């Protein structure tokens, strides 16, 4: 049986940690300063976040056949 391939789009967007958490970049931050946003929303878009447990299970199961 051939090897299962990891989705290359998921490789670029997610990082699976040893604890099983899935780290991701925040959305809506690419054109951060091109239009008016509140300082609070700019601060909250910095850095990375983690997916919720149910979403993380789906991502790992569907996108990473060998668990990331």
UniProtKB/Swiss-Prot annotation:
Annotated GO CC locations: ribonucleoprotein complex; ribosome
UniProt xrefs under InterPro entries: Ribosomal_bL35, Ribosomal_bL35-like, Ribosomal_bL35_CS, Ribosomal_bL35_sf
PROSITE patterns for this protein: RIBOSOMAL_L35 (PS00936)
Region (Disordered): 1-54
GO BP terms: translation
GO molecular function, a single term: structural constituent of ribosome
Keywords from the named record: Ribonucleoprotein, Ribosomal protein
Ranges of compositional bias, category Basic residues: 1-11, 19-29
Superkingdom as given in the UniProt entry: Bacteria
Protein family: Belongs to the bacterial ribosomal protein bL35 family.
NCBIfam families xrefs: rpmI_bact (TIGR00001)
Protein name: Large ribosomal subunit protein bL35
Gene name of this polypeptide: rpmI
